């Protein structure tokens, strides 16, 4: 029938409360080179709001430097003092709101293989260590999960957007069927990117399924309430859309892909641009059915995602 089902999906948005107020400081230390790069690159006038135009014949405010120069010139007896004494905002003032949707489904709890880990012990190694009398103690670190890396990438995005003074919000999403689509509000548009938001981001846990279409529609509606001229939705996921009631077999995959693609089309028609980042190495197989090739990236090395996110921010920093 090509029609929507009324009251078919229930989305529940709730604030995420975190208790680790050191999480943001820890992240900034962990990614210190990238954070320094962000502050150097994105806190500059080239990245943020354009400078006011000065020394104009008319404008919305007096240019104090120009007025002072004109006064000095008059007192010095110069009759042809410059009368361009005003300043104004550029006509194309930067105005951007960004919403980040972070996939928190169960699969994001999978551990990432450590490319720098030593090779597994062999039987010969055991014999050698027994002869030496002991095996050296190694500090065991818990394995990094997909969600740990995507949360770091989300935090670095917030660092850059805050440096540019752009409004931004972060939502985690997961669910368990059409009546339980969970949206965790990590940071709202008007809230600062500070320790409480960092703690909320750190508190996100992998759980449930990936009903991406419903999450996209919800985030798009939140963006449409924003006063900015440009509205951008970024979806960060580790796999294709799936939920318990999508059906079985190929039908389940087709349903999720088509629903997500339709949600993104609706958002675009309403004035919300979108970009999709996937850390699934096989994502090209299905992402081309969700959005055009220039609207998604596949990051095959998950631990390269934070740096890749900064490349996306550079695109956002360009004038509309």
Predicted regions and their residues:
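Acidic/polar low-complexity segments with low predicted structural confidence
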Residues: 1-98
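Von Willebrand factor
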Residues: 91-236, 241, 275-281, 308
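Short secondary-structure boundary/capping segments
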Residues: 114-119, 184-190, 247-254, 289-295
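Glycine-rich, charge-decorated loop segments at or immediately adjacent to ligand/cofactor-binding or catalytic sites
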Residues: 138-139, 283-293
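VWA/integrin I-like adhesion module and closely mimicked acidic/polar interface patches used
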Residues: 203-209, 220, 239-288
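C-terminal helix of von Willebrand factor
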Residues: 293-320
